[in-house]
UniProtKB/Swiss-Prot annotation:
Keyword tRNA-binding: no
One GO CC term, this protein: cytosol
Required cofactor(s): Mg(2+)
Binding site for GTP: 27-34, 53-57, 70-73, 136-139, 167-169
The name this protein goes by in its record: Probable GTP-binding protein EngB
CDD domains: YihA_EngB
Domain EngB-type G, residue spans: 19-188
Source organism superkingdom: Bacteria
PANTHER family linked to this entry: ENGB-TYPE G DOMAIN-CONTAINING PROTEIN, MSS1/TRME-RELATED GTP-BINDING PROTEIN
InterPro entries: G_ENGB_dom, GTP-bd, GTP-bd_ribosome_bio_YsxC, P-loop_NTPase, Small_GTP-bd
PROSITE patterns assigned: G_ENGB
Gene name linked to the record: engB
Keywords assigned: Cell cycle, Cell division, GTP-binding, Magnesium, Metal-binding, Nucleotide-binding, Septation
Length: 191
C-alpha cells in the first residue's frame, strides 16, 4: 500500500483541518496497535516498542483519500499521573469531538481483556461511531481456546460477536479479514 506518515498532533487543534474521513486505532499500552498498523499497511510506518506507553501523540497516516490515526495507549503505561490524565483527556476529546472520525478499531489482547477495555467500549458506543474489535496476539491461544475466547471477549465487552475478529501481527493470521473489515468501517459511514 502506498501509505505514508502525515503528522503527529498533541491535541485536536493540531489535527488536520479538512474533511478527509478517519479511522483510529486504540487500545491498552503494549497491546500491539503500532504493530497492527504496520501489518495493515504492509510497511513500517508506526514506531513500535517493547516499552508500554511510547505513543503519546495522535499519529496520522494517509492512504489515498483516507486517514488512519494511531492513538496513545491507555492503561499501564509507565508515565506520571499528569501525562496519564492528559492522554485520557485527549482520547476522550478525540472520540467525542473529532468530526472526521468515522470509525474506531479497538485492539485488545486476546488473552487478557480488562475493565478498562470495557469502559472504552462504553465510550465508543455512546459516540455512535462504527467500530471493530481486534483480538490481537491470538497466536498465544490454542485452537480450542480461540472460538470461546472471542465469544467471551464479545460477551465481556457487551458487543455483538460479529464486531470482533481475531488477529496475530506476529504470524499475520487473519490480517486480510481485518484489512477488509477496517475498510468496511468507511463504507458503513457512507450509508
Amino acid at each position: 500500500m502506498d501509505a505514508h506518515f502525515l503528522k503527529s498532533a498533541s491535541d485536536l487543534k493540531d489535527c488536520p483541518q479538512d474533511n478527509i474521513p478517519e479511522i483510529c486505532f486504540m487500545g491498552r499500552s503494549n497491546v500491539g496497535k503500532s504493530s497492527l498498523i504496520n501489518a495493515f499497511f504492509k510497511k513500517k510506518l508506526a514506531k513500535t516498542s517493547a516499552t508500554p506507553g511510547r505513543t503519546q501523540l495522535l499519529n496520522y497516516f494517509e492512504y489515498k483519500d483516507k486517514r488512519f490515526v494511531d492513538l496513545p495507549g491507555y492503561g499501564f503505561a509507565k508515565i506520571n499521573k499528569n501525562k496519564k490524565d492528559f492522554i485520557t483527556n485527549l482520547l476522550t476529546q478525540f472520540l467525542n469531538f473529532r468530526s472526521n472520525l468515522v470509525g474506531v478499531v479497538l485492539i485488545v489482547d486476546s488473552g487478557v481483556v480488562t475493565v478498562q477495555d470495557q469502559e472504552v467500549v462504553k465510550i465508543i458506543l455512546q459516540t455512535g461511531l462504527n467500530f471493530l474489535i481486534v483480538a490481537n496476539k491470538f497466536d498465544k491461544l490454542n485452537q480450542s481456546e480461540r472460538y470461546f475466547s472471542l465469544k467471551n471477549i464479545a460477551n465481556f465487552l457487551k458487543v455483538n460477536f460479529d464486531k470482533c475478529v481475531f488477529a496475530s501481527t506476529k504470524t499475520h493470521h487473519n490480517l486480510a479479514l481485518v484489512h477488509k473489515k477496517i475498510f468496511e468501517l468507511f463504507v458503513e459511514d457512507e450509508r
